[in-house]
């Protein structure tokens, strides 16, 4: 260690690199400590010397204010080498930021990593306070613990060593006993457990028959497996999963003893009148007794309704048939089938009530119609679509009872169940629409996507925009619809008021007209389209546009099946034939609404009904003209992409990145150009930041482009549009630019210069600079001819190492570049390469 030559010095070191990213204070701090000086980490009143270099302005000002000696790092080095305390005035510190304005604050960011010191209570005051607080809290918890509370001991890995289970169980039981005693004193209702319920059912089976399923379903509701199953669980899922298995085994003994047919039949009749909710969520969460009291109130209301002659033999018949439907639907196991009477109240989905109504409707309908309906249900892809085909007769009969019950049970319904979707939609409708006058009106349902596609394929869309006619779409025959019914003569003529120009809008109008129509046969779909091909008063069928099908798909936006060649046919028979599964056809009736005068003027071949005379109307070539006009913009859009991209490109050269970013932003704002890295066939403008002769400038001159300065972009941005280029053309530096540009504008076809047209064949050396490809392109653009081999050429451009001929000129690359710049062939004598 050196001698303590600076023992009276208390120094504060602030030494940074000139760019303010590196802090070198630590090195000089070590040297000062070695020489016996004290180094302060902060600038306090004890500091006598400040070693300063490129430090903070505040440190400089503070040192000058206090009169502390400001020295440079050279003073420290001189003291170390001389081994003595050198005079500070010989090495004053310099402040480079002193003359800079005070508004500019120089940011400092040291790139050296900090020394990481692990926090301990000894070296960190905040950590020490937190540690002391935790120790006090732990001591307080230890003193407040009772003797009977067990103390749990843990190993280092976190596993439990000692757990006094006897004390835990005893304290748990004592707490339970206290709670039970309190509830008895307050006379609160105690919910019986499952074992107590089974014991009560053995003692009094007739009374507990309705109570046990309620509590069982509540236990099932509270089980984890039920909640994991979701809300859309069916009866099989709820009663067949693992969550109900324990309850099923517990109940087997008691259920086998319960064989009272009277009670089961009464409960089935009760379930017939009560619209049960689709899940167990209708149970009251307070206690089963409260729900039983609510149920008893509903039974009283039901008995009053029964006394008022609301229940009819039709309902009894519906009850029996609904029970059979329920058994067939869910295939109950032998154990559960014995208790289906009372589980029917709690777990039957709401759709079963709709099915009951459908079956009761079937009992009143003729056998033939019922067989058709069953056959169509079996054939249907989605049988649930048929649920809405019930009659309004049962709703008329049991209307008051259903209204009274629906008000009481609405809070228990699973509102988001898919079975309730159609009932929710029907609740929003007025009562007149909920009670239809006849069952046939239910066939006027909304069309599926497949049916819509088939209608589009078989429709004549050339009829858009010329002449109005009315099309009545009768009963459609497809897989999801039952066999076609006989069409009547009194078909509805409800015509939509909107004249459409697209098939989708026409179909929407068709649906609206179908809803407004009240015809007995349900032939209510009509929409108005316009047809140029048919004369006034012509009755014919719609034929598919086979020739222009692809155009039709582009215009309408269809993304589905291709045309299968199917055409719409009109049936002569009273009933339509069954359609094949692979090609669904639709019976379309096209009737024109004409006045009596027009009907008198019709030729004989066109008179009569379509049904009696199924003539075929072939689409002529000129009938597609209107439709082709409609889809022409779509074809052009498809060919050219979503939008037209700019055909002109702009190239930047000799331009720094800041200016390039400005140009890119201006081009994005004003549009009309796309940026290209090099000059190509589509380039029209070359922007040069500096008037330097670059390859892009020469290629731009050779192609007849505008060679402009950077100011053109700035002025265009100022005025908000691309302005005239001529004032900003660099014609002074590149005289050939305006000449080539004028020639390019005057040329009829693709522009090619004539500068080297009279010159002999040239060969460009592979060692030339600029590269061979660029030089060859320049010569070609200026009308010259380039050979791939040197023996065919009379001029060789660039350094050539082969055998030289006396008849061949060996010229420098500058000859080509200067000739293009000046737009004249320069004298070759000035560019000859040494032999």
UniProtKB/Swiss-Prot annotation:
The modification Phosphoserine is found at residues 279, 287, 296, 333, 548. GO terms for biological process: cerebral cortex development; mitotic cell cycle. The modification Phosphothreonine is found at residue 335. The keyword Repeat applies. BRCT domain 1 is required to prevent abnormal chromosome condensation. It binds directly to the SWI-SNF chromatin remodeling complex. BRCT domains 2 and 3 recognize phosphoserine/phosphothreonine marks on proteins with high selectivity, and mediate interaction with phosphorylated CDC27. They also mediate the dual recognition of phosphoserine and phosphotyrosine in the C-terminal tail of histone H2AX. Implicated in chromosome condensation and DNA damage induced cellular responses. May play a role in neurogenesis and regulation of the size of the cerebral cortex. Interacts with CDC27 and maybe other components of the APC/C complex. Interacts with histone variant H2AX under DNA damage conditions. This is Microcephalin.
């Amino acid at each position: 260690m050196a001698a303590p030559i600076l023992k009276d010095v208390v120094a504060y070191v602030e030494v940074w690199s000139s760019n303010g990213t590196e802090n070198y204070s630590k090195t000089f701090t070590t040297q000062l400590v070695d020489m016996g000086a004290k180094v302060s980490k902060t600038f306090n009143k004890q500091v006598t010397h400040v070693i300063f270099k490129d430090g903070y302005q505040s440190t400089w000002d503070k040192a000058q204010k206090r009169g502390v000696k400001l020295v440079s790092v050279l003073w420290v080095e001189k003291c170390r080498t001389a081994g003595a305390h050198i005079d500070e005035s010989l090495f004053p510190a310099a402040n480079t930021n002193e003359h800079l304005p005070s508004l500019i604050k120089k940011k400092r960011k040291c790139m050296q990593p900090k020394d990481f010191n692990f926090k301990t209570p000894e070296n960190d005051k905040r950590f020490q306070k937190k540690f002391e607080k935790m120790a006090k809290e732990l001591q307080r918890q230890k003193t407040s613990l009772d003797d009977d509370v067990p103390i749990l001991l843990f190993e280092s890995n976190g596993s439990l060593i000692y757990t006094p289970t006897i004390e835990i169980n005893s304290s748990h039981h004592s707490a339970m006993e206290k709670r039970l005693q309190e509830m008895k004193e307050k006379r609160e209702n105690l919910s019986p457990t499952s074992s107590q319920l089974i014991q009560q059912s053995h003692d009094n089976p007739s009374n507990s028959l309705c109570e046990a399923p309620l509590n069982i379903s509540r236990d099932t509701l509270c089980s984890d497996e039920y909640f994991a199953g979701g809300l859309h669980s069916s009866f099989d899922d709820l009663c067949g999963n693992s969550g109900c298995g324990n309850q099923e085994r517990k109940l087997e003994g008691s259920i086998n003893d319960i064989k009272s047919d009277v009670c089961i039949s009464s409960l089935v009749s009760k379930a017939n009148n009560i619209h049960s909710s689709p899940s167990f969520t209708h149970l009251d969460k307070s206690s089963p007794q409260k729900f039983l009291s609510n149920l008893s109130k509903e039974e009283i209301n039901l008995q009053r309704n029964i006394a008022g002659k609301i229940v009819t033999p039709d309902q009894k018949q519906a009850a029996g048939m609904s029970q059979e439907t329920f058994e067939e639907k869910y295939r109950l196991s032998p154990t559960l089938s014995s208790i289906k009477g009372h589980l029917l109240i709690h777990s039957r989905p709401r759709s079963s009530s709709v099915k009951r109504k459908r079956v009761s409707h079937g009992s009143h309908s003729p056998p033939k119609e019922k067989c058709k309906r069953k056959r169509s249900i079996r054939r249907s892809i989605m049988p649930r679509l048929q649920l809405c085909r019930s009659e309004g007769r049962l709703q008329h009969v049991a209307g008051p009872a259903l209204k009274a019950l629906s008000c009481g049970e609405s809070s228990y319904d699973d509102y988001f169940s898919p079975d309730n979707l159609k009932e929710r939609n029907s609740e929003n409708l007025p009562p007149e629409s909920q009670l239809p006058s006849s069952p046939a009106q239910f066939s006027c349902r909304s069309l599926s996507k497949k049916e819509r596609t088939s209608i589009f394929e078989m429709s004549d869309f050339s009829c858009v925009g010329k002449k109005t006619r009315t099309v009545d779409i009768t009963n459609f025959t497809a897989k999801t619809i039952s066999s076609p019914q006989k069409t009547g003569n009194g078909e509805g003529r409800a015509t939509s008021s909107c004249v459409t120009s697209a098939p989708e809008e026409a179909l929407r109008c068709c649906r609206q007209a179908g809803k407004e129509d009240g015809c007995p046969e349900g032939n209510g779909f009509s929409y108005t389209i316009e047809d140029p091909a048919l004369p006034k008063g012509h009755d014919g069928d719609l034929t598919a546009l086979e020739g222009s099908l692809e155009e039709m798909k582009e215009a309408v936006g269809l993304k589905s099946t291709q045309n299968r060649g199917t055409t719409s046919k009109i049936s002569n028979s009273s009933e339509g034939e069954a359609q094949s599964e692979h090609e669904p056809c639709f019976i379309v009736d096209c009737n024109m609404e004409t006045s009596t005068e027009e009907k008198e003027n019709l030729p004989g071949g066109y008179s009569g009904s379509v049904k009696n005379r199924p003539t075929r109307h072939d689409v002529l070539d000129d009938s597609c003209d209107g439709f082709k006009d409609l889809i022409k913009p779509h074809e052009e859009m498809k060919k050219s992409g979503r939008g037209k991209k700019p055909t002109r490109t702009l190239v930047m050269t000799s331009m720094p990145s800041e200016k390039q970013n400005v140009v890119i932003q201006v081009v994005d704002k004003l549009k009309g150009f796309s940026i290209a890295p090099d000059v190509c066939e589509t380039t029209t403008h070359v922007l040069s930041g500096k008037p330097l002769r670059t390859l892009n400038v020469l290629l731009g001159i050779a192609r007849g482009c505008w060679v402009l300065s950077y100011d053109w972009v700035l002025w265009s941005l100022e005025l908000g549009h691309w302005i005239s280029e001529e004032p900003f053309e660099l014609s002074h530096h590149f005289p050939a630019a305006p000449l080539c540009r004028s020639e390019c504008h005057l040329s009829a076809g693709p522009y090619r210069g004539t500068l080297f047209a009279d010159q002999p064949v040239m060969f460009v050396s592979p060692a030339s600079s600029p590269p061979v490809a660029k030089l060859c392109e320049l010569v070609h653009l200026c009308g010259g001819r380039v050979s791939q081999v040197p023996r065919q050429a009379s001029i060789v451009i660039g350094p050539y190492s082969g055998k030289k001929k006396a008849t061949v000129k060996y010229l420098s690359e500058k000859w080509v570049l200067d000739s293009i710049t000046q737009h004249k062939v320069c004298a070759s004598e000035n560019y000859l390469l040494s032999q």
